[in-house]
Regions:
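Short, membrane-interfacial amphipathic segments enriched in basic
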Residues: 1-14
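Helix-loop-helix units of permease transmembrane domains in multi-pass membrane transporters
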Residues: 14, 132-164
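Membrane-interface helix starts
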Residues: 15-33
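Helix-capping/transition residues at the boundaries of transmembrane alpha-helices
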Residues: 20, 134, 145-147, 211, ...
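Central hydrophobic cores of alpha-helical transmembrane segments
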Residues: 30-35, 222-235
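Secretory targeting signals
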Residues: 39-49, 60-61, 76-132, 156-223, ...
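Terminal transmembrane helical anchor/hairpin motif
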Residues: 45-79, 90-107, 230-326
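Transmembrane alpha-helical segments in integral membrane proteins
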Residues: 116-137, 311-331
Length: 334
């Protein structure tokens, strides 16, 4: 196969995946969800929250100290007394705030990533794309491509890669749009927020192969949806169990065999909690807005190793994709 032929096939795969994405019954809901997130970012307003760059001393005064010294004296020293609000949805939601504007933006972004690239955003992406493989294997393109001298494994991998491309395009619109809307609304441009796009794509690559395998095995969209959500939930529970064991006392910890089994499962499966912690660290919010205590302790003690977590998660996805390709070689499935 020449390079031009490969690109032509990938172009066909990507075009078909885009068609499936737009034709999906979830596409209108996806558009509404994305518009809602971007609108929420665009309507952020700050009341009485200054920028840290406006002060020589980038720190705020505690309430007790402010009451003792007085607002005027603090202002002379370059230390502001902040008693502001974060306002969302044109003021419908108000959150009291006592830190600088940059901190308020990081706080909002730390909440935003939960709905764009972390748990909610990833699960939405898995549900949206779950039907692509079953539909592809029963459709026109699959039957046409099988007439060419191409292996079924190559076609499945090409289709999967095209779905990752489609997901990435949507991620650029959702995360990029949210970042631009928030930057225009607040005049604070935090480039670290864009790490959430990379984490979304990597997480999708790690978890979507389970949906590919289930779709290949069952040819059912519903099985792929339920199975991929269940797979994510199992991975989350295993990840949480390991972190809990690390932070537990001797009396509270599991038995030796249980710990051993949990560790094997942890290193074998993708690690959603690790991804959340890694993203928080990349965005620079992990200490300012820390995760649950057990998670933070595991991170600070070096028990969560970013490169090892991501690497082993990607290896597990490769293994699942290999099983998916083997499933297609079953004569009954072809």
């Amino acid at each position: 196969m020449t390079g031009s032929q490969f690109l032509q096939i990938m172009k066909c795969f990507t075009g078909e995946s885009l068609r499936q994405a737009v034709a999906s019954y979830l596409f209108p809901l996806l558009l509404f969800y994305s518009a809602l997130i971007i609108t929420l970012a665009a309507t952020v307003r700050f009341s009485n929250i200054p920028e840290a760059s406006s002060y020589e001393i980038a720190q705020r005064a505690p309430k007790e100290e402010a009451a003792r010294v007085g607002k005027e004296e603090l202002e002379k020293s370059g230390i502001p007394l902040i008693q502001g609000e974060i306002r969302l949805l044109f003021g419908a939601v108000k959150i009291p705030w006592v830190k600088f504007r940059e901190s308020a933006v990081r706080y909002f972004e730390s909440m935003l990533v939960f709905f764009t690239s972390d748990a909610v955003g990833l699960i939405f992406a898995l549900i949206w794309t779950a039907g692509f493989i079953p539909e592809f294997l029963q459709g026109f393109w699959w039957n046409m491509l099988r007439l060419r001298p191409l292996s079924t494994g190559f076609m499945l991998l090409g289709k999967t890669f095209s779905i990752v491309i489609v997901l990435s395009l949507h991620g650029i619109i959702l995360i990029g749009g949210s970042w631009i809307a928030l930057g225009i609304a607040t005049n604070v441009w935090n480039g670290l927020f864009l790490w959430s796009f990379a984490i979304l794509v990597v997480q999708f690559i790690c978890f979507y192969p389970a949906s590919v395998f289930l779709g290949t095995w069952s040819r059912s969209t519903m099985v792929a949806i339920i199975g991929s959500i269940a797979f994510w939930a199992i991975c989350w529970m295993v990840n949480h169990a390991r972190i809990s064991n690390l932070s537990a006392t001797t009396a509270e910890s599991s038995s030796g065999v249980a710990i051993w089994l949990i560790d094997i499962a942890y290193w074998t499966l993708p690690k959603p909690i690790d991804f959340s912690i890694i993203l928080s660290d990349l965005m620079g919010t992990i200490k300012e807005f820390p995760p649950p205590t057990a998670w933070m302790n595991a991170f600070e003690t070096g028990n969560i190793m970013p490169f090892a977590s991501i690497g082993t998660s990607l290896i597990s996805s490769v293994v699942v994709l290999w099983f998916s390709c083997m499933e297609l070689k079953d004569p009954i499935k072809e």
